[in-house]
Every structure is written in structure tokens, then in C-alpha cells.
Amino acid sequence: MFRNPIPFKFATFFLSVFIMMGGWAYADDFSESEFFEESNGTEDSPGYSFENEKSFKERNNFFDSNLNDLKITDSRTYTSSPRKRERLRDSQNRLNFDRDYFYGIFSDIAYTATSPLRWDDSDWMTAAWIAGGTSLFFILDEEIRDGFEDNRSSTIDDVSEFFERFGNGAISLPALGAFYLYGYFGENAKAERTALIAVESFLVTGLFTTVLKATAGRHRPSTGDSATSFDGFTTDHGSFPSGHTSTVFAIATVIANEYEDVPYIEPISYGIATMTGLSRINDEKHWASDVFLGAALGYFTSKTLLRLHSDKKGQHFTIYPRVDRNGGGIVLGKRF
């Protein structure tokens, strides 16, 4: 019986805050008409953009006949549309569902698995914090389990059942597949990329989680055994770490990263992942330390894969003409 509520409340609050935070710390062809459009202003200055070179020349004769000299006959500003530039960047970052994608998963697994060989001092410090947090929850595991049991109700069970689904691959993978199709048929490169990286993160994180489960062989809370019951090197018991939590955090991290410009995406993504992790404790499927390590594993695995894909897409250049009352020229943007 859980007698002292202080450790339980502290541990639950700490766990929730951590996983809500998500842990401690090829360009396609664009036609000119697709890239340029008329607008009333840009983030830099008010003005107008142009649809193509012809309309640009016809609008007050900006170019002479041989196109070698640029002359200003209007005080208005002409620039490419920010919205079109964003579309171009998304196209440059496109990830295709092809043979290279599948081959890349295997190389990414090898790179991620050997990441500790390339860690610097800050990485090792982060790993130490995670190990310390896992150890802390390991000490409090049984008290936290008892605290959840004492506060359990049919309403909480219903909420837990709802959020458990987000960590179920039979549901999350088809959902990601549907999101990819939405991006593919809707010509939304960001949606395609997000879905494909999320699927890869799910698979890679799931593999690492399975290896750890088999290595630890920890008994689940539902068995009635103590939190210190580890058989080691067995598939009979797979409590440590939580697979639902690790994979849902892997997906949430990708979505939050790819849609970081949308304010509500990050809190919703990590909020759902947090509730999924807590549902596993409520349902006595996992100890709190299982959930804590699972969240960290999913988060940092996805961060590593996102960096890999960022490197793979290369350093792209965006070039567009710009003319204003002070002169004209070519704007060259480099994406790192």
C-alpha cells in the first residue's frame, strides 16, 4: 500500500515535465511561373513580385533589349514571393519513397548505433543525466506503481486506453502511411518528408528498444514481481524500456521538428507522447523508469536521424532576382 504521497507526486511531476520537454536538451525543377507571383510586400520591404521574366520586362521595361543592362524606371520593389521561396525549400528537402530510402535506413541504423563513438563531452553529460534520471525512477518505481494504483478509476482507465493507441504500431504506421499519401498526391513535400522520417524513426527506435528489452529481461508490474526482477537475455519479459513510449516519442520528435514553425504542433505532439507513456504506468505494463528511458531513447534517436537527413539533403542554393529603388541584382540564399 502506498503510504507516503510525496515521492509519488514528485516523481510523477518530474516524469511528466521531462517527457513533455522531449528530453534534455534534392531540389525538384520549379518553373518561373511557379516561383514568382505578385504580392503587396515581403518580409524585407513592400513591393511587387513578378510571374516570369517576360512579365518582369513588360512591367515598365526593366531590362533593355539585350538583357545585359539593368535600368530602373520605377520606384516600386520587385522580389520573389516568400511563400514560393518556402515551397522551393520544401522541394529541395524532398525525401523520396524509393530504393535509396530503404537502403538509407540500414546505413542510418549503423550510424546511430555507433553514435557513442563520436560523442563529445556535452553528449556524455546528457547520457549521464539520463542514466541518473533512470536510476532515480528505478528507486521510486514501486512507490509510483502503488500511487497510480491507489488513484486509478474507470475514467482514468478510459483516458489511458485512448492514449495507448498512439504507441501501437498497428495504428501509428498506417496513420503515417496515410499522411505520406496526403503529401504525395497533394504535392506537399514537407508532409512526405515528415512521414518517411517518422516511419524510419519508428523502425530504428523499435529495433533498439527490442534489443534492450531482450538484454534486460525485466518483469512487468502486472506480474506482481518486484521492480528489481531482471532475468537478462530473454524474450519472456520485456518491460525495460517501454516500446510504446520510445516509438511514440520518436514520431512526436520528428513531427515537432519538421513543423517547428507551427506553434501548437510541438506541445500537442509531446503532450500526446507524454500521455501515452503515463498510460503504460497506469495499465501496469511498465515501470516509471521504463517510460523515462523509453522517452529519452525515442527523442534522441529521432534527433540523430533528423541530423543525418539534414546532412543528406546537402547545401542548396536559392537564386532569385531583386530590384528596388536603390538598384538591382541577384539574391543568393544558401541553406545549411
Cite the ranges covered by each PLM segment:
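Bacterial N-terminal signal peptides
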Residues: 11-22
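Alpha-helical transmembrane segments
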Residues: 127-131
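Alpha-helical transmembrane segments of multi-pass membrane proteins
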Residues: 133-143
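Perimembrane loop-to-helix junctions flanking transmembrane segments
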Residues: 149-159
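Hydrophobic cores of alpha-helical transmembrane segments in multi-pass inner/ER membrane proteins
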Residues: 173-179
